[in-house]
Amino acid sequence: MLNVKFLEAELRDQFFLDDNKRAWIIGFSGGKDSTMLLQLVWNSIKQFPAEIRQMREVYVICNNTLVENPKILDYTDKILNKIEKAAAEQGMPFRVVRTTPKLEDTFWLNLIGRGYPAPNNVFRWCTERLKINPTTKFILDTVSKTGEAILLLGTREDESTNRAKNMRKHERIGQRLRRHILPNTYAYAPLKDVTTAEVWQYLLQVPSPWGASNRDLITLYSNASGGDCPLVVDTTTPSCGQSRFGCWVCTVVSKDKSMTALIDNGEEWMLPLLELRDLLAVSRDSDYYRETRRRDGTEKEGQMGPYRPWFRAKILEEVLKAQEAIQIEEPQMSLISYQELVAIQILWYRDSIFEFRVSDIYNQIFNSDMMKSDKLEEQKRREAEILQQVCKESSEDIALINEMLTLQKSKILLRKKRGLSDDLETSLERFLDKIVPK
């Protein structure tokens, strides 16, 4: 039977137990488990006098992969705003931290820009880049300031057999904290013995201290199938692919039941997202869409490389079409950022993809000149004319010079000069292979 007073007493005891004032970091996803955890911590600390509450930093960290289910992202963002406002009004020590992947780690930059195939269980390149790295960076930055940190997680043993085994593997008998994989970091799972039924019982009976309605959360769950999206800080923690509220682009699972259910329950504006996700799923294992040579230049029977240039351009086109479609109902929603579009073009240049341009695809769909600059285009035309005059006897020389200039420019824009000489050498070798008979 759920004993709320016991759980709150445990939290208060742990709050006072530490002499070194190490920070608390609460993993918050907006789902049922992390909501219950934050409510318990909030109500426990609120019983202290104001000066005691401020004795340690308490962070509420929420990671946005930038490809979250948009319905859930909108809900979570509103909740985080309420938490920030209520914490300030009530004199609580909570600080909301929103983390996102670095530009070079975003989903679209890797899939469209570098041509990485849609993730599967064998090549799940997304989890570390989108989830683990942003959260880990914040935790390590916090540890460097406070010496140590305690990571409070809403994980429960009855969520899955694997989760239970992992929790028991690291816990110590008679101790609340267990060593985390990150240095000087401890994990604390106050809800580890709480059942799913008890979570719902608590949320129905205990009002949100930041003024939200838990019934809104229940409505979200009633429109899809169960599970929660945990804070992912290591590869042993199941990512959202096996839970209900995951990334809308996730192809690790065969079918996105949550998005399908949301569409069936009236969120028809999300249909373009589901169709795009299904396109990624069918393209993953076909050499029609993927190169036969890998990015490192090796070629082996039974193995495939990145997406072919034409399909990368096709995916970008479909992403932008989906964005145009959903903005009819949700005008503030964006599936891909302007920074990602610019970076994708740079990566295409680095992969010697010159037949497709991001700006052409964007402007065709949105009937816009947003990504064009008249002065820049005029300068490029003048440079092209000069190059044509100088290299009028050899069109191959023009292509080589353009390719090498683009490679150098891409390195400067990405602030990564490492590998420039190798890229230039590869370009020269490819050029010589074409003109020198073997």
Residue ranges and their predicted role:
Residues M1-I25, K32-K438:
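Nucleotide-activated chemistry modules centered on ATP-dependent adenylation/adenylyltransferase
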